Every structure is written in structure tokens, then in C-alpha cells.
Amino acid sequence: MTSLTLALDAMGGDHGPHVTVPAALRALKSHSSLKIILVGDKTEIDVYLRQAEQPLLSRIEVIHTDEVVSMSDRPVHALRTRKNSSMRLSIELVRDGRAAACVSAGNTGALMAMAKVLLKTLPGVDRPALVSCLPSVTQKPVYLLDLGANISCDSETLFQFAVMGSVLCEAVDKKSRPKVALLNVGTEEIKGNDQVQQAAQILQNTDQINYTGFIEGDEIYSGNVDVIVCDGFVGNITLKTSEGIAKLLVHQLKRGLTQGFFVRFLAKLIAPRIQAVLSQMNPDHYNGASLIGLRGIVVKSHGNADETAYLQAINLAVTEAQRRLPEMIKDRLESILLDINN
């Protein structure tokens, strides 16, 4: 790939440089043309850079700041007072063109507030959305948005989310005309609140979006659609519930496989297959939520992500930057709005 620079909020998340720096080094090993700017406390960052190979260090820049957005900071407070924080400086690097994307595991509300103010939304986009991919029984990813950036949404906003989600799926998975559905309490046309009903009418009249209708909660993981759209209140609860169920299933499976000698013996025989299944159910495998609809790329990692999970978020940022996701969304939205207005 051509040279690409990412900005990492090295201090964000529960583990800070203990996770972000080793993950950055692993990303550099995987992407030979990648450069990374680590933003945070240089003294803490350097601890994890001491043993790094020189060729990797030559592709790392450290910008020092000892100010951090805490997980307890309210978004407005962080926006007004944390002007030299590692999170804000990382976003500013994207705004100023020094980085193609930024990744942070920090305070979600603060990240969204700073990103919206500093990067601005794309033309035709009222609000950015938080989107992530989920597993499915067909083993293809399913994109769900919004995941909490917007608690309530009108029909126009849901329509914009559908467009952005469709373009994201095309860009990341290179899928032609991905199937888009609205999450609803039923599949019948009469079901749903006014916002969902009106959004459905707009999408039905938009030829450039492959809208398939409503989808219920029990079909989210079926793999029958590629993009599922809802407001942030519903999306966040759906995501957190899914993660909780996944953890429960993993726990129950591990517990069941340790009860009794014969069961333990069989478990050892099929250990690789069991590990593969557990990996697919692990939420860390899908770490990285994109804040789309902005004039720059911002990827949010889980706050408690380990090194491997954080690496997933970095890889997602690389992919979106390579595909020039904001430009793709802008062009597609302009084309669709032109068709609608004509």
C-alpha cells in the first residue's frame, strides 16, 4: 500500500500504553508502509518502545502530552477543558491532514463530541453514526448502526445512516449492492413508529440503496442482510446485550467441557475446533466501531480491549483510510440526493 499515517490516542482506554503501544508495533510489522503517531505521555510510551526493532521505531513519532480525557469526563466538559489531551490532539492530526485516521479507546461521548466539532460532518449528513460489525451464521459480517451516537433519530437521519452503512460495507468488504434493512418490532409494513415507517418509505423510493425491508431482533445474526439500521438507543442496547450473551455462552461452554473425565478427554481431541468457535463468539474479534459521516476517519476501540483487540481497531482504520471512506460516502450521498431531488 502507499504510505499511510495513523494517529493513536496512546493514553485512551483502561490500559493505556500497556496495550496501545504493543498493538501499534504489531500493526507496523503487518503494514510495511504504515507510519504511526503516538500521542500521550512520552515517558510512559517510551517504556514500551525500548525493546522495539529500529526499523519499526523509524516509522513511529511520539507527540508528548500529559493531559488525558478520563472515562468520567462529561463530553461537553472534555470538549471545553481538555484542549491538550491525547484524544483531542489525535483528532486534530486528522483535521490538519497529518494523519489519515485516528484510533482511540477513550471516553466514547468525549470522542464523538470532539470529532464532530473538530472534523465536521460531510455535506448532506446531519449527524455522524457509530457503526460496528457483528458475526452471523453465514460467517459474513453484519454492520449495525447507530450504536449510541444518537439516542433518538428522525426518518431523514435513519435514511442517511442507511446510505452510510451501505457505502461502508461496499468499501470495507468490497460488496456490491449490500442488503440494507431497518430494525423493527415486526416485518409487516404496518409495524414500527413514525420515524421507522417514514424512513422505510424514503428507502423504498431510493434505487441506489438495496433496501430489503424490516428485520426483527432474532434475525440480526442470520446473515440475510448486510447492514441493519436503527437509532442509537436501540443499537446500543442491542450491541451490549449481544456481547453479554456471547460472554455467557463462552462461559457455559467452557464450564460444560470441564465436567467429567470423558468430556474433558473429548474436549482435548477437538480443542482446535472449540477454540475456533470461541474465537468467533469473542466480542474482541470484532473490536473497532467507526464514527462515520465525518470529514475524517475516527475508530473507537473498546475501553477494555487487549493488545489483539486494539490491533483489530487499528487494522479497521487502515482499511477505511485506504478505501477513502469519507470521500466514498460524500460522493454516494450527493448522487442519491440528486436523484431524489430530480
Curated annotation (Swiss-Prot):
Coiled-coil parts of chain: none
Catalytic activity, as annotated: a fatty acyl-[ACP] + phosphate = an acyl phosphate + holo-[ACP]
Location relative to the cell: Cytoplasm
Any one Gene Ontology BP term: fatty acid biosynthetic process
Keywords: Cytoplasm, Lipid biosynthesis, Lipid metabolism, Phospholipid biosynthesis, Phospholipid metabolism, Transferase
GO cellular component, one term: cytoplasm
Family statement: Belongs to the PlsX family.
Subunit structure: Homodimer. Probably interacts with PlsY.
Job description of the protein: Catalyzes the reversible formation of acyl-phosphate (acyl-PO(4)) from acyl-[acyl-carrier-protein] (acyl-ACP). This enzyme utilizes acyl-ACP as fatty acyl donor, but not acyl-CoA.
Name this protein carries in UniProt: Phosphate acyltransferase
Gene name tied to this protein: plsX
